[in-house]
């Protein structure tokens, strides 16, 4: 009677490996979250540190720019440094313009990467395009690496676009320019993928993307792309923007496609605020998937928005504190307390919805609103277990959460 998201689109499964770590994109695998560094890749230590931060935040693949000989030479050192730190997240090399040369001249770089990103719009010009694209595919075959053929409308193959514009002009009923652009993106991606297959790369080694900046543009392109091929698909706006605008745009575009069963891996291309951690894009990607019920990454905190009954900021401060605490604990809890990522915590501001929401969560607290009895009942698995009062409600509630996690999700509990 009631429906959720559409069944997942069937696609080829692409395995991305490093050591004992396997991340599968597509097939029956969950939708993956990936990210990209913004360090100078030639700075091996700085890049390794940021990769570690992104991996600890939950990024399952991390892309790094490989744009110069110095960057290519640093990749093996980055991989070695990460392995020493116990960080086995696969690295994706992002190549533009000179990737065919860097993969040829720096074989250790080619081997240290787990996946290559190729942009068919700038792999070469004119007659050189086919040979330089072929060289990159041959490197992927030689080193047994999957590739993402990533088309961007900001760097689209201009020869292809010009030819399609000419063909469109000769139609009895020409398409709108926007439709020609969509078709050029799709033809560039699928045509390049089919050429890679002709060169010997398996379909289970290819991921496709067609990135644009507009929400409706992305949805239109991916709906058609998904209909016309069986390759695994990487979703993301090419530039989402800063702050709430970037988050809203990414959520709208990616959420619409995921709801239709389209998409196998996502990257949220947020412009970080000055001084803000790069890990924000990972958190947003995870929260999109978790909010849609597609995956679970960390306990969810439900909190009311507040109203005239909640003139105190206590519930807001407590919700933020608990949410931050849960996120900070997840790198450890993920391995020690399997299943904790599905836990729900409610922090409510008054008696209207507080007790009801708290009973529906694994753990909930209903703080007193304006004029209410200054007491905060705590509910665990639907039952009222305690009433907190005084100045230390936050500390006491955090301890209750911590004790519940250890008791409910600890290895001993899991075995019983």
From Swiss-Prot:
Keywords, alphabetical: 4Fe-4S, Iron, Iron-sulfur, Isoprene biosynthesis, Metal-binding, Oxidoreductase
Cofactor remark: Binds 1 [4Fe-4S] cluster.
Name of the top EC class for this enzyme: oxidoreductase
Pathway recorded for this protein: Isoprenoid biosynthesis; isopentenyl diphosphate biosynthesis via DXP pathway; isopentenyl diphosphate from 1-deoxy-D-xylulose 5-phosphate: step 5/6
Enzyme Commission code(s) on record: 1.17.7.3
Domain of life: Bacteria
GO molecular function, one term: iron ion binding
InterPro entries recorded: Dihydropteroate_synth-like_sf, IspG_bac, IspG_bac-typ, NO2/SO3_Rdtase_4Fe4S_sf
Reaction it catalyzes: (2E)-4-hydroxy-3-methylbut-2-enyl diphosphate + oxidized [flavodoxin] + H2O + 2 H(+) = 2-C-methyl-D-erythritol 2,4-cyclic diphosphate + reduced [flavodoxin]
GO biological process: isopentenyl diphosphate biosynthetic process, methylerythritol 4-phosphate pathway; terpenoid biosynthetic process
Pfam families cross-referenced by the UniProt entry: GcpE
Binding site for [4Fe-4S] cluster: 304, 307, 350, 357
Cofactor(s) needed for function: [4Fe-4S] cluster
Role: Converts 2C-methyl-D-erythritol 2,4-cyclodiphosphate (ME-2,4cPP) into 1-hydroxy-2-methyl-2-(E)-butenyl 4-diphosphate.
UniProt record similarity statement: Belongs to the IspG family.
Listed name of the protein: 4-hydroxy-3-methylbut-2-en-1-yl diphosphate synthase (flavodoxin)
């Amino acid at each position: 009677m009631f429906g959720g998201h559409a069944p997942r689109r069937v696609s080829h499964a692409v395995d991305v490996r490093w050591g004992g770590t396997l991340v599968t994109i597509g097939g029956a695998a969950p939708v993956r979250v990936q990210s990209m560094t913004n360090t100078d890749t030639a700075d091996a230590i700085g890049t390794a540190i940021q990769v570690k931060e992104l991996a600890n935040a939950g990024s399952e693949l991390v892309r790094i720019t490989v744009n110069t000989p110095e960057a290519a030479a640093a990749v093996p050192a980055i991989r070695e440094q990460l392995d020493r730190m116990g960080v086995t997240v696969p690295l994706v090399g992002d190549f533009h313009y000179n990737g065919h040369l860097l993969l040829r001249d720096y074989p250790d770089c080619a081997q240290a990467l787990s996946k290559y990103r190729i942009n068919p719009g700038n792999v070469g010009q004119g007659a050189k395009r086919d040979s330089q694209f072929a060289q990159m595919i041959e490197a992927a075959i030689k080193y047994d690496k999957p590739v993402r053929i990533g088309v961007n409308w900001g760097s689209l193959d201009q020869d292809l676009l010009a030819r399609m514009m000419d063909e469109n002009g000769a139609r009895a009923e020409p398409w709108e320019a926007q439709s020609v652009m969509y078709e050029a993106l799709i033809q560039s991606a699928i045509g390049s993928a089919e050429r890679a297959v002709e060169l010997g790369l398996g379909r289970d080694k290819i991921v496709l993307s067609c990135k644009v900046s507009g929400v409706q543009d992305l949805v239109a392109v991916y709906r058609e792309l998904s209909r016309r091929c069986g390759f695994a698909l990487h979703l993301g706006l090419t530039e989402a923007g800063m702050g709430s605008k970037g988050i809203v745009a990414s959520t709208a575009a990616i959420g619409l496609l995921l709801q239709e069963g389209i998409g196998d891996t996502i990257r949220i291309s947020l412009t970080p605020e000055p001084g803000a951690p790069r890990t924000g894009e990972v958190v947003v990607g995870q929260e999109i998937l978790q909010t849609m019920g597609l995956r679970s990454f960390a306990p969810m905190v439900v909190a009311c928005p507040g109203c005239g009954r909640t003139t105190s900021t206590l519930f807001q401060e407590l919700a933020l504190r608990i949410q931050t605490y849960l996120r900070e604990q997840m790198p450890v809890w993920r391995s020690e307390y399997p299943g904790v990522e599905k836990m729900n915590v409610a922090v409510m501001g008054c008696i209207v919805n507080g007790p009801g929401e708290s009973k529906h969560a694994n753990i909930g607290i209903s703080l007193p609103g304006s004029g209410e009895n200054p007491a905060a009942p705590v509910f665990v698995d639907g039952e009222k277990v305690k009433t907190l009062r005084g100045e230390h409600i936050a500390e006491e509630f955090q301890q209750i959460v911590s004790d519940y996690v250890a008791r409910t999700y600890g290895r001993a509990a899991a075995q019983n």
